[in-house]
Structure formats: structure tokens, C-alpha cells
UniProtKB/Swiss-Prot annotation:
This is Large ribosomal subunit protein bL33c. InterPro entries: Ribosomal_bL33 (IPR001705), Ribosomal_bL33_CS (IPR018264), Ribosomal_bL33_sf (IPR038584), Ribosomal_zn-bd (IPR011332). Pfam families: Ribosomal_L33 (PF00471). Belongs to the bacterial ribosomal protein bL33 family. The gene is rpl33. One of its GO terms (biological process) is translation. Keywords: Chloroplast, Plastid, Ribonucleoprotein, Ribosomal protein. GO terms for molecular function: structural constituent of ribosome. It is found in: Plastid, Chloroplast. GO terms for cellular component: chloroplast; plastid; ribonucleoprotein complex; ribosome.
Length: 66
């Protein structure tokens, strides 16, 4: 039997430039991706470069709390 918490957890990645540039009302919305991470290999917050359809470019998406 497995003890403790699950090793793999589901996380949400949110575009950091959309959150900061909320003044720009042309593209209303914040890009979010759902993925999984291994808690043992990456204990810190995850940041990945993903495509944001609201910014029309690749930006840094950071892990947020649920």
C-alpha cells in the first residue's frame, strides 16, 4: 500500500504577462494550462514557456494555487 500523499499532482499554469498587463482590454482573458508534476523531482513552483493565445506569443506560465 502507498503511504503519504500522491507523488504526481495536478497543477494549473497561468500566463504571467496576462496577469500583469490587465490594463490591455483588447484581449479579455487569461491563458491557463492544466498539467501534472512529480512532487519529488520538482518540489518548487513550476514555470514553463507556453503559447498564450491572448498575448499572441510564447510567455512564461507559472504555477498557481487551486
Amino acid at each position: 500500500m502507498a503511504k503519504g500523499k500522491d507523488v504526481r499532482v495536478t497543477i494549473i499554469l497561468e500566463c504571467t504577462s496576462c496577469v500583469r498587463n490587465d490594463i490591455k482590454k483588447e484581449a479579455a482573458g487569461i491563458s491557463r494550462y492544466i498539467t501534472q508534476k512529480n512532487r519529488h523531482n520538482t518540489p518548487s513552483r513550476l514555470e514553463l514557456r507556453k503559447f498564450c493565445p491572448y498575448c499572441y506569443k510564447h510567455t512564461i506560465h507559472g504555477e498557481i494555487k487551486k
